[in-house]
Amino acid sequence: MPKQKTHRASAKRFKRTGSGGLKRFRAYTSHRFHGKTKKQRRHLRKASMVHSGDFKRIKSMLTRLK
């Protein structure tokens, strides 16, 4: 049976934390900042953790991610 491969697009978007969680970056940060407040832009800079409902699905795509 062949090995399960890592989903490369997901591997570029998620990082494993030391405690075993998954860190992600926020959407809506590439353009059109004139419609967003300063507070929104500041909060979009911060990384966030993957929610528990999505964790299992994303973890299965990142089988060999350290």
From Swiss-Prot:
Disulfide bonds: none annotated. GO terms for molecular function: structural constituent of ribosome. It comes from the Bacteria. The keyword Ribosomal protein applies. Keywords: Ribonucleoprotein, Ribosomal protein. PROSITE patterns: RIBOSOMAL_L35 (PS00936). Residues 1-21 are annotated as: Disordered. This is Large ribosomal subunit protein bL35.
